[in-house]
Curated annotation (Swiss-Prot):
Disulfide cysteine pairs (residue numbers): none
Record-linked InterPro entries: Znf_C2H2_sf, Znf_C2H2_type
Amino acid composition bias (Basic and acidic residues), ranges on this chain: 257-270
Function: Transcription repressor that binds to the promoter of target genes and prevents their expression. Acts as a negative regulator of epithelial-mesenchymal transition and metastasis in breast cancer. Specifically binds the 5'-CACCC-3' sequence in the promoter of ID1, a key metastasis regulator in breast cancer, and repress its expression. May be a germ cell-specific transcription factor that plays important roles in spermatid differentiation and oocyte development.
Higher taxonomy: Eukaryota, Metazoa, Chordata, Craniata, Vertebrata
Protein name: Krueppel-like factor 17
Gene: KLF17
Keywords: Activator, DNA-binding, Metal-binding, Nucleus, Repeat, Repressor, Transcription, Transcription regulation, Zinc, Zinc-finger
ZnF locations on chain (C2H2-type): 280-304, 310-334, 340-362
Alphabetical list of Pfam families matching this protein: zf-C2H2 (PF00096)
Family to which this protein belongs: Belongs to the Sp1 C2H2-type zinc-finger protein family.
GO cellular component: nucleus
Positions with biased composition (Polar residues): 30-46
Gene Ontology terms describing biological process: regulation of transcription by RNA polymerase II
Length: 387
């Protein structure tokens, strides 16, 4: 206590002004909405001149922890927690996100660069009840304004930075005490210290799109080459463990395969449709047939004219044919000449197509060594004798 008193005597601040600043820094405005609105707890420190300079000493930090622990624990049970400075000086908020695929921890350091912006000195990941779920506390800093609806929006675009306030609430331990240093701070992990405020405000809305939605199946992040991740990749990775590829939607590149299949199908179709050269066309009306040989065209034209030059010379036979091969098959009926013989049963046929049709019957039924038994099986069972 004596060392704390000596530390207090070293600061050129009046006692009554120091007490007034301490009480104002520890005052909280609790705003608890209904469960349907997401359970938002808002707290800010108002003062006549914005954020004041508070001496950093161990005794004051213990007092701040003791006095702010009770309201913060009740606020954490309601859901996400926002810590805000006055709207005219800026806004800093800490949304809480939960990832089930892999535990990710955001760690952020601050460096003084520009005035008029709220600041936090680090955020820690708080464990939850389930061992497989990790709570991630993310700290953003920038010039923001608070509309009447309650969502922080960026001044140039008016896009809400937190669009998933209605997430399921989970209790966690209170965040560490946030000491105000008086100087404005900006994050040096997400953005370059020399980056102008307009680029800072342009990057923050893109970070809000990476927050998960209610439905775990809708969890998706922009690809690695997207413009929203370029400033993050330039400063290094901010995740302790990489997210597995199972959490990202699988993109199947089927377009080249489909194009290749279509080209192959077209080639096959063109191969079928490309006929052999048929220079001999039938000139009769509504016919349009073509042939590779002139003899085939002549025999075809005989069907149009009705001419049958090939006549059977067998006695008492009046058959005539368009082609000579047809006449030769017909004469075998009279001579009983059957040149085509089955090698399994010994039957003979006048035409080769009749032999092939007969050989299919042997494939459908078991082979019999006796040709007569085979012929009797084809004829059918014998009738039973009458007793």
């Amino acid at each position: 206590m004596e060392q704390g008193a000596e530390g207090l005597s070293q600061w050129p601040v009046a006692p009554h002004q120091f007490t007034e600043d301490t009480e104002k820094s520890l005052s909280f405005l609790d705003m608890s909405s209904s469960p349907g609105s997401g359970g938002v707890h808002t707290s800010w420190n108002r003062g006549p001149s914005g954020i004041r300079r508070v001496p950093q000493c161990p005794e004051l930090e213990r007092m701040s922890l003791a006095s702010a622990q009770a309201p913060r624990q009740s606020a954490c049970e309601m859901g996400q927690q926002f810590s805000m400075s006055p709207p005219e000086h800026g806004l800093s908020y800490c949304p809480q996100m939960t990832f089930t695929a892999s535990q990710m921890v955001y760690s952020q350091g601050m460096s003084p660069s520009q005035p008029g912006m709220g600041a936090f000195k680090g955020a820690q990941a708080m464990p939850l009840g389930e061992p497989s779920i990790s709570s991630v506390a993310v700290t953003f800093s920038g010039n923001l304004r608070m509309p009447p609806s309650g969502l922080p929006v960026s001044p140039p675009s008016g896009i809400p930075l937190m669009s998933h306030i209605g997430m399921p609430t989970m209790p966690y331990s209170g965040l560490p005490t946030v000491p105000f240093n008086g100087d404005a701070l900006t994050p040096n992990m997400f953005l370059d210290p020399t980056m102008p405020p307009t680029e800072v405000q342009a990057v923050l809305p893109s970070l809000a799109q990476m927050l998960p939605s209610r439905d775990p199946q809708d969890f998706a992040m922009p690809p690695a080459g997207s413009p929203s991740l370029l400033p993050l990749e330039s400063q290094g990775s901010f995740l302790s463990q990489p997210v597995s590829q199972e959490d990202f939607p699988k993109h199947h590149l089927c377009e080249p395969r489909r194009e290749a299949q279509n080209s192959r199908a077209q080639e096959r179709a063109s191969g079928r449709s490309s006929p052999v050269s048929r220079p001999y066309h039938c000139e009769y009306e509504n016919c349009g047939k073509a042939y590779t040989k002139r003899s085939h065209l002549v025999s075809h034209q005989r069907k149009h004219t009705g001419e049958r030059p090939y006549k059977c010379t067998w006695e008492a036979c009046t058959w005539s044919f368009f082609r000579s091969d047809e006449l030769g098959r017909h004469t075998r009926i009279h001579t009983r000449y059957r040149p085509h013989k089955c090698d399994q049963c010994g039957r003979q046929f006048m035409r080769s197509d009749h032999l092939r049709q007969h050989q299919r019957t042997h494939m459908r039924m078991p082979r019999s060594p006796d040709p007569q038994a085979d012929s009797g099986r084809r004829a059918g069972p014998l009738p039973a004798p009458h007793l």
